[in-house]
Every structure is written in structure tokens, then in C-alpha cells.
Amino acid sequence: MKPITLVSGAAGLLLVTGCAGGSSSNADADLTVAASFYPLQYVAEAVGGDNVDVIPLAAPGVEPHDLELSPSAVRELSSADLVLYLSEFQPAVDDALVSTQSRAFDAADAVELRPAEEHDHEHEDGEEDHDHGQLDPHFWLDPTLLAEYATAVGQQFAQLDPDNSATYIQNATDLRAELTALDETFTSGLEQCERRDIVTSHEAFAYLADRYNLEQVGIAGIDPETEPSPAKLLEIRDLVEETGTTTIFTESLVNTSVADAIAKDTGATTAVLDPIESVVDDDDYATVMARNLDSLRQALACA
């Protein structure tokens, strides 16, 4: 793990459309930490407890890739003690960090990101292209990697606030234990299944698939807005028919039209598999992961 990166910081941030929600301000906190999207916020809140005021940059239910920051929001970045972010995942955050030169911690310094799978796609002008050299950001869908990140965040908080270091380290240890238990539940729940192929809206589930011995087939690549090529669509339809796939997985924040069409053409059904980039209402990481496991077990006919 690399040391704290002095690239930027963030406080309560406003989206172009308004204030990011999801966490109330804690005026008595010892640290103010901004989290650029939900999984990082989840870890920060669990590890920081009452000692940390966690400010979410992205509003609940909003696609974090599309985050935009107003000039006033960028100005407020510099007032936080630390910003938690993932480089190259949200360009607006990267730009704000460069301009403010405040303290930040990149999740890529805590966990090893895997290369994105190469994926044929088409631009709006119809030209076909490929993904090259891109890293897959969705590490949090493997609970063991999120546990590694939690440990690193605990160390970061302890460095910034030594008086509460024991609390941060203990909270990180407790969260790691919870995530380890979740991993064990997934392992046992997906151990004996009739099928192991999952067709997803975009390639967000490679970490989960690798961890639990599944095969991901993404309709789109790492970028959920990318249109799949005709060849890719034909490949997916053939795979669905050849493997007896019964479910095409969709996402609440991604357009479902292509997935719906594939399901209609092949006689499959659709179900939500959530990449947990954002949450709404009373959901949190654990509750959404539990629903994901239920959806996978039903789709894959697991014992």
C-alpha cells in the first residue's frame, strides 16, 4: 500500500443539480472525510464511527460515473481532512483533486485492480473500437477486497487522528470480520449450482465472478453507456441458448432496453444484479449483497 497521496481533499460537495445526500453532518467529529461514491462511503462510515463526519460526493441513486461538481463544490473540496476516491473512475473528482491539491487516498493504492476484459463496442458514429489498458474499478463486489480496503482506511484515519487510532483499527477489524462472514456465505451459497454463466448489463462483476467461480458475460464493457457491437449481441444470444441461461441481469441505474431485447429473443427472464455503485432508501452494502446472492442462486439454480 502506498502512503497517503497529497493530491486533493474534499468537504461537503454539491452536485451541479444540488447537494449530495446520504449522510448527516457530525459537527463533533474529529475528522471530515469526503467519499467519492457509495462503497467508499460505506467503509468510511463503518471505520470512522462517531469520530468521522463522512460527506458523500455522489447523491443516492445517481450513476457515480456521471458525477459533475459545481465550482462551489470544488472550492469546498479543500476543507476536508481526507477524500477517499478511486482514480480514473470519476473524471470530475480526479480533476478537482488536481486543482485543489488537498489530501486524498486512492483506493487503487489499497487493492490491486484487475485489467478490464477487452470488449468490442460501437461509438455513436458506428465505428467499432476496443477497450485497451483499462482497469476494472469494481473491486468492492469481492468482499475480501473490500475488507483489504477497510484495513487501509483504518490505517489512514489512525495516521490523521492518532488520539482515536485504536478505535479506527478496531472498527476496521470488525468490518473485516463482517465482510469475511459475507464472503463465506457467498462461497457456500454458490458452491453447488446447475449453471455458472451470468449475463450482465455491463462488465461490473468480474471480481465477484472470479471469487465465486462464475463466468461473466457482459452486454456492455466496463463503461455501461457503451453500445455492444452486433457481433457481441449475436455471441450473447448464442451463449444464452447453448448454456440454458434463464436470466439476463439488469441494473437499476443502467438502461435495460438491450437486456430486455435479449431476454425476449431467447425466452429468458430479467432480474436485477446490483453493482452497488450507489444505494437508495435504507439499503446498504450488506443488504444489497444479500439480494444479489438471492438473485444469483435463483438464476443459477443453486442447491
Q: What positions do the PLM features span?
A:
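Extracytoplasmic metal-acquisition and chelation regions
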Residues: K2-G12, V16-A303
